[in-house]
């Protein structure tokens, strides 16, 4: 067998025939992977690497090191840098110092909130109640009515007629006869007064009264040639007008006739139904109270039946018919002013004057026979008047 003749310029390093392949695409044999390798410069096999891998001055592979990273004995290590608050360095561990309302929860930095602050949809917000709104990304007062803002943006109270703001006080702006010091009052002159019920009232003297329409008229006590005529108030009624044990269970007739400083009284009562038709008690009393002007107050007698005899008008301001408060002191449990004893049957009657703390009153008392209808005989009494 004839040996193949080897050319004198044969190169045993791959690629073998460089002269026939002047453009060498890759210097590694086809059975070697090109991963991690490259031809740089052409015809030279070299490693392919990127940062942080590099070579040193001795053409040895090494790493690029940043700040706080060192290579000691072939090992990489990190050096925790010097920190400033709120960062901390403890045992080569970097941390974050927090104080309320900032905290760390579930490895996350959180913000602790309390009402009215809240966190909604990962956003810090504020809850507003009545009187507050959020306008133009700011919390604002929501005024209404007389409240408003002045030129400096301060909340103020708008005052209209009759009121004004003086310094830090809201005061009444009044004119006479009104007066406002600690409270609103009314200056009164002669002829006017304020009643216990807080009403402005005209003070009436002798000979004057109010009619049913509230107008001032001459009273029923008329002076004729220097002699005072007799006047009468009574409770005459064809229908039941008195409620003792139940509604309208009796008919009460009371007649007061004035003559000078005295009043002659006549009274009779008749039970019409219920317990008054068959008495269980051995006594019965009826109290008629009046205010300081002689007006009948709420009691057993229907006030609509208490009228002047002469005009048939409802009696009002009958001060001239009231028991004298000096002769008959108020709320005294003294002996009754009059007493009448009937012999057949034996019925006792008495009347007590001004058994009341204020104003005037008549308290009529009768004895009764249990088991029988209550209908005592007519009684007569006399007393001295207030005027």
Curated annotation (Swiss-Prot):
Main location: virion
A Gene Ontology biological process term: symbiont entry into host cell
GO cellular component: host cell nucleus; viral capsid
Pfam family, one: Adeno_knob
Keywords (A to Z) from UniProt: Capsid protein, Host nucleus, Host-virus interaction, Late protein, Viral attachment to host adhesion receptor, Viral attachment to host cell, Virion, Virus entry into host cell
Keyword RNA-binding: no
Matches recorded under Gene3D superfamilies: 6.20.10.20, Adenovirus pIV-related, attachment domain (2.60.90.10), reovirus attachment protein sigma1, domain 1 (2.10.25.20)
Induction: Expressed in the late phase of the viral replicative cycle.
Record's subcellular location: Virion; Host nucleus
Superkingdom: Viruses
SUPFAM superfamilies: Fibre shaft of virus attachment proteins (SSF51225), Virus attachment protein globular domain (SSF49835)
This protein's domain notes: The tail region anchors the fiber to penton base capsomers, whereas the shaft, built from several repeated motifs, allows the knob to protrude from the virion.
Function field: Forms spikes that protrude from each vertex of the icosahedral capsid. Interacts with host receptor CXCAR to provide virion initial attachment to target cell. Fiber proteins are shed during virus entry, when virus is still at the cell surface.
Protein family according to the UniProt entry: Belongs to the adenoviridae fiber family.
Additional facts recorded: All late proteins expressed from the major late promoter are produced by alternative splicing and alternative polyadenylation of the same gene giving rise to non-overlapping ORFs. A leader sequence is present in the N-terminus of all these mRNAs and is recognized by the viral shutoff protein to provide expression although conventional translation via ribosome scanning from the cap has been shut off in the host cell.
The protein's assembly and partners: Homotrimer. Interacts with host receptor CXCAR. Interacts (via N-terminal tail region) with pentons.
Record-given protein name: Fiber protein 2
Organism: Human adenovirus F serotype 40
